[in-house]
Amino acid sequence: MRAALLYLRDSNFEPAAAQALATNPRFGALYETLAHYATITRRSHEAADFARRAVALQPRLWRAHLSLGMSLLRLGRMEEGRAAVEKSFAGDPFNVWAKNTLDLLDSMRDFRETRRGAFVIKADAKESDVLAPYAAELLEEAAAKLTAKYRFTPQGPVTVELFTNHGKYHKEVYTLP
């Protein structure tokens, strides 16, 4: 936890991590914990890197595979992310987060991507032709206003997913069975 505290303070956490690994060189949970804190502070690239380190140290740490998969999905690396989530679920078939994530990804197989400017809009193929142009216009308008207001431009592309069934999305992402 000391390494995580230092990480959250943007301090050098490596000496604390090295100390923990000196006690147990296969302590993947160290980097899985760092991945968790990177995730909740919206540092997906760092979360993925930490999760990879956790998996390298402790290959059967299934929650680290899930953390890696979720981070990769957030980064838009869908195939690699799905593979990591599948590996997590194969190792721990009782993990509801892994199961629900795989169900959600399955429900998105028929989605079509529309790229416009800094945005990637994903919607059901049956609705994409109708929704994507309106969504793109709204997103570009909102982005212009928010970029000016907050003086921040997100690194693109920004992915927006449109679901026809809000209840399914909500169930898959936010709840347990």
Spans of features found by a protein language model:
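Juxtacatalytic substrate-recognition/specificity segment
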Residues: 15, 111-177
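Canonical tetratricopeptide repeat
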Residues: 1-2, 33, 67, 101
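Helix-start (N-cap) detector for alpha-helical repeat units in TPR-like alpha-solenoids
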Residues: 28-29, 62-63, 96
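Structural motif corresponding to the intra-repeat A-B loop/turn of tetratricopeptide repeats
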Residues: 7-10, 41, 75
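Canonical positions in the second alpha-helix
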Residues: 19-20, 53-54, 87-88
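Residue-level signature for tetratricopeptide repeat
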Residues: 5-6, 37, 71
